[in-house]
């Protein structure tokens, strides 16, 4: 996992080049937006249980066959595994938000996840819907302007959305 700084410096160092003005400007913007990023991660982390629970409730309301006898989330053990997986995906999304880089999400969470679900007979499309529902919950919480650093957060929220979209696409 590389943060944005390490990634840029490593690339330039490998080429034997100085940082460009555009790269310095982009990294400076990242620093100036760091409080917004921290606020976003804190909000999502502080509400992780509610995000997962609400997303799961919504998913199971839309797809009741998942919790019916024979469904992939039927029995408390399978339900717990489903909620655990959703929580793990959410946790890695917060790591990506904090780092400003999706590599930790890709490398440590999503790599091979679709194959695992296929092997277990878990419908990837349902997992993807659950991830999208977590995205909706997380963005609603992160976009609440009460008690956070002021300023335009639209770019950060778009970035946050892409991490959830990557996760959903990886399992679909």
UniProtKB/Swiss-Prot annotation:
(2R,3E)-phycocyanobilin 2 binds at residue 153. (2R,3E)-phycocyanobilin 1 binds at residue 82. One of its GO terms (biological process) is photosynthesis. It is found in: Cellular thylakoid membrane. InterPro entries: Globin-like_sf, Phycobilisome_asu/bsu, Phycobilisome_asu/bsu_sf, Phycocyanin_b. Keywords: Antenna complex, Bile pigment, Chromophore, Electron transport, Membrane, Methylation, Photosynthesis, Phycobilisome, Thylakoid, Transport. The keyword Hydrolase does not apply. One of its GO terms (cellular component) is phycobilisome. The modification N4-methylasparagine is found at residue 72. Its main location: membrane. Contains two covalently linked bilin chromophores. It comes from the Bacteria. It is a peripheral membrane protein. Belongs to the phycobiliprotein family. Heterodimer of an alpha and a beta subunit, which further assembles into trimers and the trimers into hexamers. Light-harvesting photosynthetic bile pigment-protein from the phycobiliprotein complex (phycobilisome, PBS). Phycocyanin is the major phycobiliprotein in the PBS rod. This is C-phycocyanin beta subunit.
């Amino acid at each position: 996992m590389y943060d944005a700084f390490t990634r840029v410096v490593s690339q330039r160092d490998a080429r034997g080049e100085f940082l460009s003005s555009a790269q310095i400007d982009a990294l400076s913007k990242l620093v100036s937006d760091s409080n917004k990023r921290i606020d976003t991660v804190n909000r999502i982390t502080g509400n992780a249980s509610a995000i997962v629970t609400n997303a799961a409730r919504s998913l199971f309301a839309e797809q009741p066959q998942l919790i019916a006898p024979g469904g992939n989330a039927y029995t408390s053990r399978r339900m717990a595994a489903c909620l655990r997986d959703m929580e793990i995906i959410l946790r890695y999304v917060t790591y990506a938000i904090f780092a400003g880089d999706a590599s930790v999400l890709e490398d440590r969470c999503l790599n091979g996840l679709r194959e695992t679900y296929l092997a277990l007979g878990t419908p990837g499309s349902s997992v993807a819907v659950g991830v999208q529902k977590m995205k909706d919950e997380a963005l609603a919480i992160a976009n609440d302007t009460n008690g956070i650093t002021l300023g335009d957060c639209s770019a950060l929220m778009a970035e946050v959305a892409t991490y959830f979209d990557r996760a959903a696409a990886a399992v679909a």
